[in-house]
Amino acid sequence: MNLQNKSQAFEVNNTEGRVYWGMGILWTMLATAEDTNGAYSCIEELIPQGPAAPPHIHEAAEETFYILEGEATFFVEDQPIKATAGSFVSIPRGTKHAFQIDSETVRLLNTYVPAGFEYMIMATTVPAEARTLPPASMPLPEREQSNLTMEQIIQKYPAAKTNFLRGYEG
């Protein structure tokens, strides 16, 4: 990845981005490393009520959330942050965090700087058949959807490395 190359301007509508189902979430890829020359990625997520992400740490990426619709509680170093439509939450790299969805659903924008984590998502989900939440009975993917292994993704995009921690403090 050559970050000295200049990215090109682009526009993508959330009805056009590549969509994936996994972990009960609809993931819409709005910007990936290829689009931004590795600078950042941006994903729109539709998430149902309940625990959304267990405690984890992104060692090499900053992460932000902008709540478009609904309500969520983020746990940053175990401290709760209530977020509603219009809220922006910033998580510095190396910070333990988790979150849960308090409303029926949440629609949010999730950004990673630098890019890379989106490939972990694409490798562990399946292409969505509709722009809706996945069916509750959907089985876990049997194989990676990416041509890269997890190790290759982390090697190519160090920002994809995530440490998942035990326990849910929320």
Question: Where do the model's predicted regions map?
Answer:
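Short histidine-centered beta-strand/loop micro-motifs
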Residues: A31-T32, A52-E59, Q100-I101
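A short, N-terminal "cap"/entry segment at the start of jelly-roll beta-barrel domains
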Residues: M1-A39, S137-G170
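Ligand-binding loop in jelly-roll beta-barrel domains
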Residues: T36, T73, R93-M122
